[in-house]
Amino acid sequence: MNRYILFFIFLTGSVGGITAQQAKIDSSYANWYYQQRMAYFEKLPTIQRAVIFLGNSITERAEWQELLADYRYPVLNRGIGGDNSFGILARIDDVVRNKPRAVFLMDGINDQFRKLPHEVSIQNYRRIVRKIKMKSPRTKIYIQSALPINEMITTEDYTRGRNELVPELNKKLSQLAKEEDVVFIDLCPLFQDDEGRLSKEYTVDGVHLIPTAYIKWVKLLKDKKYL
């Protein structure tokens, strides 16, 4: 699906008044890969009270079931490579249909690659969180920070100038978590270097994590008693 929709984003000024900004937003998400993953999810067995990792390719590439093979509850991977906040919002009803025990949500970087205004991403996050609360009120919700990227390694033009957008997005995600009374997990200290970039130790392409990085990720979740 390739479609563009027009948003009127209202931003409250720090001094007074409300200013309206008009932005053309790329809200597309349902490409062939998204559709194939959704078809795959639909054919999987129904599992109640699972722990779900939800997000884009950074989530999808993790072997969560193996990383948490000794965990006492089922663990499901609901990552879709290339997904963004619009795509996750569109499929959240399916994600929580079977009343998961917990949802670990991570998104954001693909929104940044499109240069979506943070207000749009946060609005989508808020709607995702509220849909989970409405459809599955006993589900524990964890918002995980967007990870930095390393523009010294990335090769695609759409990654240029994007890493500087990540800290502000994460500040707004942290504030959203407080407002919605859910848990915010800051993963950035695990994987960033002194310059705030995704450390070369943990990436090959400047965007995605190497497999062993996920061991560190899961250790943090266990240490914090989120798992």
Where are these regions (language model features)?
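Proline-aspartate-enriched helix->loop->beta-strand connector
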Residues: 99-108, 137
